[in-house]
């Protein structure tokens, strides 16, 4: 339930809500108003150790529960998530700021991840080859790996945790979850519903906090694997530190997603696609379009329509249904984004839509409106860096080849999109672009949960991505059995 009282957030360890043993807390504001809605503990190492001990004890019995039974338990959780969709979306809008429309979409994508986890009996099946030699059979068996942990960001407080713990738990593991201290309330509700579904205590544990919790997870000898989603510098740190301590790590990192606009595109649908990708969720997502490489032949027409449509977007509190762009997560992030916009102007880019001057319209929240630059080049910080905001850079290119070359020069390689009506162009793009997830006339090429999610280059550190068969492989280990009987 959403209330107006200021909440003191707790940890959930071994099936109980408990106060952190530490004394340090951090205020959690509503990004649309700046008003404090909660205080979250910055838990110390001792809290992580208690959570790991609880998960370790629970693993002894949970790992032996038959796979179909684990799946049936998740069906109960799935039903509760579906029954509480509206409430979950409202919590996301309250603490994250994204519009209720965007939050509702996130809830649905999270539910789809749990749907994947319920299909684990199929996904965990091994392989067998009889008669590999005279009287000898060979087979591969999959087993859970133990206690695993997830470290998740603020921008998708429901979807990303649900990428992790349901699938890991369905595979027979137990879990320690550390969500962003910026969005702790949704995590609380996810855990409440999880135990309402009847799971044994200790199977899922929640430890709120900041970097001390992260370091404790990475260094704890009883945690076998760590899943992470966040910025590139932190992802690199998590990967290097976790692997140094002998852990399996998947670390999904930053992005600078490019869209190539060809002269043969459907102009109206392309403009709406770019707007949806660049400005929905206030641009705070790793699959947002932040650069458009538009071919010269259509550039002026495309930009004119894009600017006109962008100027129609309303900025404000995500609970108001007419608003398209909500607030950024914190005042500090807003100031960082304004710094990038100022940098683009100073570097000589042409500011076509200025999202800085909107305070008189939206009040005291952490708002930056949709912003568009033209005349951007690779020497500018606004092209190089992940801004994580509703800021779009336009680069004019002569043809598809130049657009692909531009895209591949980025240090990131998460997602990339082409807008075209040519199958040949789409094929050339698909075969030559360096990105983990590719879209053809799809504004956000984030795959459904039954496909793997991961980028390339500085967008991903690890081997196996989240979701799909990658996720099952990450959360299990194989045993190869060669046997004969006398």
From Swiss-Prot:
Its EC number is 1.2.1.27. Belongs to the aldehyde dehydrogenase family. IolA subfamily. Homotetramer. Pathway: Polyol metabolism; myo-inositol degradation into acetyl-CoA; acetyl-CoA from myo-inositol: step 7/7. This is Malonate-semialdehyde dehydrogenase. PROSITE patterns: ALDEHYDE_DEHYDR_CYS. The active site is at residue 286. Disulfide bonds: none annotated. Keywords: NAD, Oxidoreductase. InterPro entries: Ald_DH/histidinol_DH, Ald_DH_C, Ald_DH_CS_CYS, Ald_DH_N, Aldehyde_DH_dom, MeMal-semiAld_DH, MSDH_GmP_bac. Catalyzes the oxidation of malonate semialdehyde (MSA) and methylmalonate semialdehyde (MMSA) into acetyl-CoA and propanoyl-CoA, respectively. Is involved in a myo-inositol catabolic pathway. Bicarbonate, and not CO2, is the end-product of the enzymatic reaction.
């Amino acid at each position: 339930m959403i209330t107006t009282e200021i909440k003191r957030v707790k940890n959930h360890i071994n099936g109980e809500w408990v106060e952190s043993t530490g004394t340090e807390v951090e205020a959690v504001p509503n990004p649309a108003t700046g008003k404090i809605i909660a205080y979250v503990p910055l838990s110390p190492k001792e809290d992580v150790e208690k959570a790991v001990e609880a998960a370790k004890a629970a693993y002894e019995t949970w790992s032996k529960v038959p796979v179909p039974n684990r799946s049936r338990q998740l069906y109960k959780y799935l039903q509760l998530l579906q029954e509480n969709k509206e409430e979950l979306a409202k919590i996301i809008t309250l603490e994250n700021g994204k519009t209720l429309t965007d939050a509702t979409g996130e809830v649905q994508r999270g539910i789809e991840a749990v749907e994947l986890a319920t299909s684990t009996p199929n996904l965990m099946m091994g392989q067998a080859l009889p008669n590999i030699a005279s009287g000898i059979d060979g087979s591969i068996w999959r087993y859970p790996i133990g206690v695993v942990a997830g470290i998740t960001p603020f921008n998708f407080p429901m979807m990303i945790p649900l990428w992790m713990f349901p699938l890991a738990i369905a595979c027979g593991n137990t879990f320690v979850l550390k969500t962003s201290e910026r969005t702790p309330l949704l995590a609380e509700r996810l855990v409440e519903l999880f135990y309402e579904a009847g799971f044994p205590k200790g199977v899922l544990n929640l430890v709120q906090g900041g970097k001390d919790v992260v370091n404790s997870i990475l260094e704890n000898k009883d945690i076998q694997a760590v899943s992470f989603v966040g910025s590139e510098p932190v992802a690199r740190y998590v990967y290097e530190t976790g692997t140094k301590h002998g852990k399996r790590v998947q670390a999904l990192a930053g992005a600078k997603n490019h869209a190539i606009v060809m002269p043969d595109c459907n102009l109206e649908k392309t403009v709406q696609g770019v707007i949806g990708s660049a400005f929905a969720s206030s641009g705070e997502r790793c699959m947002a379009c932040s650069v458009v490489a538009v071919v010269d032949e259509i550039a002026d027409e495309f930009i004119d329509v894009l600017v006109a449509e962008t100027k129609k977007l309303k900025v404000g509190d995500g609970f108001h249904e007419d608003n398209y762009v909500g607030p950024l997560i914190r005042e500090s992030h807003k100031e960082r984004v304004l710094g990038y916009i100022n940098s683009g102007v100073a570097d000589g880019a042409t500011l076509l839509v200025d999202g800085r001057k909107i305070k008189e319209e939206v009040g005291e929240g952490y708002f930056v409106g949709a912003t568009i630059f033209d005349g951007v080049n690779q020497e500018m910080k606004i092209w190089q860096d992940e801004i994580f905001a509703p800021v779009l850079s336009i680069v004019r290119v002569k043809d598809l080849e130049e657009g692909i070359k531009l895209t591949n020069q980025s240090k990131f390689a998460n997602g990339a999109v082409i807008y075209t009506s040519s199958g040949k162009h789409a094929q050339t793009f698909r075969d030559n672009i360096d990105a983990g997830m590719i879209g053809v006339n799809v504004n956000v090429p984030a795959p459904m949960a039954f496909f793997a999610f991961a980028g390339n280059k500085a967008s991903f550190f690890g081997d196996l991505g989240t979701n799909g068969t990658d996720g099952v492989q990450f959360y299990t280990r194989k045993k190869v059995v060669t046997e004969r009987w006398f």
